[in-house]
Amino acid sequence: MKLLSRAGSFSRFYSLKVAPKLKTSAPGGVPLQPQELEFTKLPNGLVIASLENYAPLSRIGLFIKAGSRYENYNYLGTSHLLRLASTLTTKGASSFKITRGIEAVGGKLSVTATRENMAYTVEGIRDDIEILMEFLLNVTTAPEFRRWEVAALRSQLKIDKAVAFQNPQTRIIENLHDVAYKNALANPLYCPDYRMGKITSEELHYFVQNHFTSARMALVGLGVSHSILKEVAEQFLNIRGGLGLAGAKAKYRGGEIREQNGDNLVHAAIVAESAAIGNAEANAFSVLQHLLGAGPHIKRGNNTTSLLSQSVAKGSQQPFDVSAFNASYSDSGLFGIYTVSQAAAAGDVINAAYNQVKAVAQGNLSSADVQAAKNKLKAGYLMSVETSEGFLSEIGSQALATGSYMPPPTVLQQIDAVADADVVKAAKKFVSGKKSMTASGNLGHTPFLDEL
C-alpha cells in the first residue's frame, strides 16, 4: 500500500516517433471488456504486470530498485544526474533521435525517483506504444553516457536543485533524512553541491551496471497485452542478470539540524522511527496520521477539523499550518509532526502539536475518530489509484517491494483491521522513541529537542 507523505517525486518529460498500427477493436463492433491484472515473475527475478483496459492511451513503466539509498557514499548524486540523463545518446539512438522521435508521435517519457526506486515511464497513443517502448528500452539498457553530454548536464543539475529548494519543505525533508539515518536513507535525492560537475561517465556506468539488473526490475503496462510485455522482457531486459549490489539496511540514529536564515516563517519537523512499509504496524501509523491530520481535504481549506489544528489553535493566535508526517520505506519509516508558523509563535505551535500526539498516546481518542481516520485513509488510497499514472506507480512499487500485487479490496480490509489500541501503540512509539528534528527560519523562539 502506498502511504501518503510530504516526500515527493521528481520528473523530466521528453518525447519519440511513429510505430506500426495495432488493431485494438473487436470484430463486428463487439464492445471490449477490461481484463484482469496479469502478473508474471520470470526465473531471472524480473516482474511483469499488465492490465489490458483498451484505453486509447497506453502507459508502460520500468521500475528499478535504484533510488538514492543505493548510492555509494563517495558517489552521491548519481541517481539525480540519471534522472536528467534520460535522453542522452544510447547505443541504438542519438539524443536528437530520442527527443524528436517521441515528439513525432505525441508521446511522453518521464523519469521519477524516490529514495527507494527509479521509474522510467512512456505514455502515448496505443497504436504508437511499440516505438515508445523501443526508446524506453534504449534509455534503460543501452546508455552510452558520452563525456561531453554528461558534462553539459551540469547547469541543468544546478537549476533542478535550485528550483526544488525554493520550497522550504524540500530542504526540511532532505535534512530530516540526513539527521535521522546513518546511511542508506540518509543519502540525498539531490546532488550535493560539492559533487556538482564531478560525477563522471564511469560512475554512471558503474551505477547502471550494478543496479539496473533484471532481478531489481518490474515492467508494468496499462493498455498493453501481457504477452507482448513478457516477450519484450525476456528478449531485451535479460542483459544484466543477478541481484546487483546489495543495499545496506538503513540505521536510524536521531539528532537535530537547525538552519538559522532569518525567514519570518519557521518550518519544523519532529519525527521518530516508525515502521517499514507492508506490515500491520505501518497501517496503524497511517491511520494515526489521518487521525491527527494529514492536510486539508477541501480545496483552500484551513484543516481546522484535524486534532492537531484544534490543539494548536488553543495555544496560538497567529496563523500556522500543522500536519502529521508519515514516510515508510522497505526497512524503516519516519513518523511525526510538521509545522509552519510565525517565528515568535514557533515554540507554542510545536509544543501544542507534540502534546496532542502525547494525548493520543495516553488513550485520549474515540472510536468514531479512528473510524473517520480510516475512512480518510481509504479514500485517499482509492483516489491515488484512480488515475492511470497513480495505478501504474502503485503496481510498480508493490511489484518491487513484494514481487506481487495486493488489490484495493485487500488493502481496504487491512486498513479496517487496525484497532484503536494499535493506533494508541503507534502514538506511544513516537512519543517514547528517539527523536530527529530539523528546523529553518528565524529560530530564536524554536525549541531544541531536549526542550520538548
UniProtKB/Swiss-Prot annotation:
Gene3D superfamilies: Metalloenzyme, LuxS/M16 peptidase-like
Keyword Glycosyltransferase: no
Transit peptide feature, positions: 1-14
Bilayer topology: Peripheral membrane protein
Gene Ontology MF: a single term: metal ion binding
Short name of one Pfam family: Peptidase_M16_C
GO biological process annotation, one example: proteolysis
Record carries keyword Iron: no
Tissue-wise expression: Expressed in the head region and flagellum of epididymal sperm.
Modification Phosphoserine occurs at: 367
Subcellular location: Mitochondrion inner membrane
PTM sites of type N6-acetyllysine: 65, 198, 249
Quaternary structure and interacting proteins, as annotated: Component of the ubiquinol-cytochrome c oxidoreductase (cytochrome b-c1 complex, complex III, CIII), a multisubunit enzyme composed of 11 subunits. The complex is composed of 3 respiratory subunits cytochrome b, cytochrome c1 and Rieske protein UQCRFS1, 2 core protein subunits UQCRC1/QCR1 and UQCRC2/QCR2, and 6 low-molecular weight protein subunits UQCRH/QCR6, UQCRB/QCR7, UQCRQ/QCR8, UQCR10/QCR9, UQCR11/QCR10 and subunit 9, the cleavage product of Rieske protein UQCRFS1.
Family: Belongs to the peptidase M16 family. UQCRC2/QCR2 subfamily.
Function: Component of the ubiquinol-cytochrome c oxidoreductase, a multisubunit transmembrane complex that is part of the mitochondrial electron transport chain which drives oxidative phosphorylation.
Protein name, per record: Cytochrome b-c1 complex subunit 2, mitochondrial
Organism, scientific name: Rattus norvegicus (Rat)
